[in-house]
Amino acid sequence: MIATAPDERINRVSRTPSSLARERMLSRRGEPLFLADWMRVLMIHFEVDASELQRVVPYQLDLHDERAFVSLVAFTMENMHPRLGGKLGAWLFNPIATHDFLNVRTYVRHNGEPGIHFLAEWLSSWLAVQLGPRTFGLPYRHGRICYQHDLEQGCLVGRVEDVKRGNHLKYRAEAVLGAPFAPCERGSLDEWLMERYTAFNAVGHTRRFFRVWHPPWPQCAAQVKLEDLSLLQDNWDCFKEARLVGANFSPGLHDVWMGRPHCA
């Protein structure tokens, strides 16, 4: 599925989070900055204690029915390149164009705009880890990551190890073979968790945000077995009493729009 711009018919249908995100993205000149493919995406959702979580988040939490959530997003980013620059730009970005991610994100609202805040992001690319904090204010960490997200073979397995500390995340997941991939039901908790398009982050006293855009996630429900949570429990107290509430798998999206960093 290609994240190409929808035509004018989008103005004649109900306003989805995706359509609103596209409007916000294009309200700034020069956007988007990058394009990339976000592939074989597994999102695992936890409910956590809101007051415990708020202590480590520099933005106001966005709650759903007074409940706070943290999600893990395990995926492979492929073919990241500047929107402009053609083959030369793609060649220059080749060393960091493709790598695995584990995002640990929570849900915030800033100046009336819903978004996410990354508690941490583990990347398999050492070079990308050096660049992210300097440019986007992102909390990158280096990880040894092994994903086998092959739904057709019934295999959704992941292992992430922090290179410095050695703690792990290990999981196995299942989804119904042949289940249709479709956007989340409008107004559902799944939509609230998955359809987020602005990232608010901070380094020291400097707050930044950037926006992304893509069509609504094509997804299906997944069932997850967590085998090792030390990567999370050793870093955040709120995970010691966290409750697994669900998971979603998506085959991914091509040509996701990724915006520039801005002051929040």
Residue positions per predicted region:
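Structured, non-membrane catalytic/scaffold regions adjacent to prosthetic-group chemistry
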Residues: M25-L26, P32-D150
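Internal, well-folded beta-alpha domain core
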Residues: M39-V41, N103-A264
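Hydrophobic, proline/glycine-rich low-complexity stretches
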Residues: I2-G85, W213, W217-A264
